[in-house]
């Protein structure tokens, strides 16, 4: 197990040795708290877009189902006739310039795996740039949009936001409740009180402290050809290699177990780069990966490589709440 994986496991298990990192945690908390306070006071400038900006992010390190939720938000807004754009940091991307407009036929190392997935699934206009405010301005210069979704960026206060949606893994929660590096929190837990909504991935019902949503498997898709198959393409008990280069690989492996398959788990670091050699496992079995990983593997995928398509399913209460927020944000003065 890599050091990063061991540290992540310790954060969520509450390992006592993490107490040694509390002096560094105190320094980190002071820095992030002061940074946010400067923007709240107006001492540091932020850019406010002429259209509503909705930030979808988290305060923890590790996967929370952010990309599937963004896909749901895009389609939900489109069904109401809204023109939606997306901005993202483009973690790991190496574009020729910044800001960079992501196109569906670009390579993942140029566009970033998550932005490329979003564009390939939805065709939405999407701009990447670590400076989210610059990305928003570039997007609005080329598109007439009704609103913008910011993929992550909770801590990017240079971009003013009209709505904050925070995602949390319902099973792991906030771990030991400590900030980096003694715990998984990017900001202190009381930051959640300032968010407009908290959504718990893996909660089939709403909670007193937020809404619930689940990731529902919908199909198997061939990585090389794009052919879609029903989930019963593999019979119960099917052994297969399972690849996950995401923030919480175990959640993916558990999903495969829940489909009555027998995965041989191969966890990789989040945003890992793959090659045919790195995925040449023994014994020869069908291989199933996440959709985020699949966008990086199409060029060298074998015939029996598949990705599991999943769809975010928030509760009806969240859908109703979100519709009310859209009406508020888009109400003409």
Swiss-Prot record:
Signal peptide as annotated in the record: none
GO cellular component terms, A-Z: plasma membrane
Species name: Pseudomonas putida (strain ATCC 47054 / DSM 6125 / CFBP 8728 / NCIMB 11950 / KT2440)
Gene responsible for this protein: lpxK
Protein name in the entry: Tetraacyldisaccharide 4'-kinase
Family: Belongs to the LpxK family.
Keyword Hydrolase carried by entry: no
UniProt-listed Enzyme Commission number(s): 2.7.1.130
NCBIfam families with a match to the protein in the record: lpxK
